[in-house]
């Protein structure tokens, strides 16, 4: 189904023309250590190949040579983005067996708060950061997803405005009552 006259295809979602989309963020507080830098570099480079299979990549996959930094990373946050981050972490640990990456599934707010408090190495968010979060954290978009509306083939409606979608969830009980 089109939203505001725009098809929900990869190009429209990536470019922002299709508006029912969101970004996935990896956030951190302050200077990163070598392991954090290495992991983030992987996610934004070679990891984009995996991202493209599961979601919408924000970059083109490029070659990644791990610095083989050792240590533990704790990543905390969004239940929507965590499955993808878990897969990225598993792939990264194959490239860098000296790293141990743990992904804790909570929600975006808890992940961002944990990153602000330095209770984790990265916070994961699937929502836009609030102004104070932007001041306290560095955020890197690593993937995008979109909400796509699917209706019965018999339904003649093929395009809705965001106002109409909101009405469907708040006040309308029938398709014919949409304006």
Where are these regions (language model features)?
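Exported/periplasmic ABC-transporter solute-binding proteins
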Residues: 1-179
């Amino acid at each position: 189904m089109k939203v505001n006259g725009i098809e929900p295809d990869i190009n429209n979602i990536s470019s922002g023309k299709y508006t029912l989309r969101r970004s996935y963020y990896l956030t951190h507080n302050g200077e990163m250590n070598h392991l954090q830098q290495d992991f983030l570099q992987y996610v934004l480079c070679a990891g984009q190949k995996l991202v493209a299979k599961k979601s919408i990549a924000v970059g083109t996959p490029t070659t990644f040579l791990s610095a083989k930094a050792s240590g533990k990373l704790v990543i905390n946050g969004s239940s929507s983005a965590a499955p993808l981050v878990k897969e990225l972490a598993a792939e990264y640990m194959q490239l860098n067996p000296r790293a141990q990456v743990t992904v804790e599934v909570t929600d975006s707010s808890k992940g961002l708060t944990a990153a602000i408090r330095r209770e984790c190495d990265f916070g994961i968010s699937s929502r836009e950061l609030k102004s104070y979060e932007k001041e306290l954290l560095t955020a890197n978009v690593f993937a995008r997803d979109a909400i796509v509306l699917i209706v019965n083939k018999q339904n003649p409606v093929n395009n809705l405005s965001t106002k109409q979608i909101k009405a469907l969830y708040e006040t309308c009980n029938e398709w014919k009552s949409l304006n």
